[in-house]
């Protein structure tokens, strides 16, 4: 009971708002399956909403997919508005972030659970959203934000969604004009992403049994669809 209460207290509004937006009238919420509580139970489908940190679900997903169909729902911010507040909740500034989220950003999280791609009972749905992020300069946040803390994340709008029902669906990530044998650098160039993101993608697809390593292409690793 205490664990459930702490979970609720630590959740951003985004988590509960996604659950509400994603749910159907017949869904059940916060249902116990074995030793776990799942966000939504839709018939025989257990649904987990995770806004970040896929690694926190690793054990839960591995265990539940042995007996149940499990879907992970991930809200990916396409557009973000950043609201800066003072300690008294006064709004100091509000601006639109110049960064626009892309589907390939998913793999920054998926690298934590890449093996799940090849699990038959596992599916993943990405929701492309607009969100508001509320920040407070309290010196307790990430060094990347110079100590600014994220105090709240709010759902503004669900724009679109894409479902990865099986491992083969992940091939849609790869550009159509990619060579039969390709490198991370070639993938990065065609997809207009960083080499680091390309490496995350090929790592996940290899672990999920979607592509394989076929040796070297020049000095770089060469990959091929299975």
Task: Go through each PLM region and give its residues.
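Acidic-basic catalytic patches of nuclease active cores, encompassing PD-(D/E)XK
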Residues: 1-37
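Conserved catalytic cores of phosphodiester-cleaving nucleases, focusing on short active-site segments
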Residues: 38-53, 57, 64
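Long, charge-dense
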Residues: 69-113
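Long, low-complexity, charged/polar intrinsically disordered regions in eukaryotic proteins
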Residues: 94-165
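Short acidic, hydrophobic short linear motifs in intrinsically disordered regions
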Residues: 178-191
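Short amphipathic alpha-helical interaction segments
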Residues: 193-206
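A short, conserved structural fragment
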Residues: 206-217
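Short, cationic-aromatic polyanion-contact patches
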Residues: 216-226
